[in-house]
Amino acid sequence: YDGLKQDFFSINVNLFVASYRGYGNGIGTPTIINSLHDSENIFDYFKKVLSDKNANGPIIIMGKAIGSLSALYIASHHNEEISGIITESSFSGPKYCAEISGVELTQDQQNELENFSHELCNSITSPALLIHGEADFMIPITEAQNLFDLLSSKAKDIITIPEADHGNLVILGEEYYWWAIEEFIYTHCNISPY
């Protein structure tokens, strides 16, 4: 996010970025359970940082790809504490993550993950913005549509970036991408862009 922080600052928001075990600068083994556990600890730490700094502004949770699962998990457990959730190149739950990782699942495991995904997404009532590339073959756009359909949020939107794939979403959709995020933040955080 180093390359994007100026873009976030230009729309008058602060940015808190975290890495998970086995991703970015995080050490350890990346697993679905670890990332969900880590997301709760990270959110608790984030709230402590805000409290220590006497910062009490609105909170938007954002996650990309595998990070979207952690963002969904936080949103599902903290609807009242956040102003919204933004996902980028997201999927509707851990079942898809297991499938693309090549993990063999029994029918019972598939059913359990499917139920977990539905419960997770159905419990989210915070406003939601989903951003996805139309040419994303790593996580097909149908996954974002499934997620959109599962969310209980009354205020939700999905935007797609034509010709964008998993890695070039921000580059190809730059103006539309930032406009959508800006509008979402200003609408759901009750702040003015000026």
Identify the role of each PLM range.
Residues 9-27:
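Conserved alpha/beta-hydrolase
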Residues 164-175:
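Catalytic histidine-centered segment of alpha/beta-hydrolase-like enzymes
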Residues 123-125, 130-132, 136:
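Short beta-strand/loop motif that positions the catalytic acidic residue
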Residues 135-139, 166-168:
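Acidic catalytic loop of the alpha/beta-hydrolase fold
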Residues 70-126:
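Hydrolase active-site cap/lid region
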Residues 126, 140-149:
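Short alpha-helix in the alpha/beta-hydrolase fold that links the catalytic acid
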Residues 1-7:
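The serine-hydrolase catalytic nucleophile loop
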Residues 29-52:
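Alpha/beta-hydrolase active-site loop
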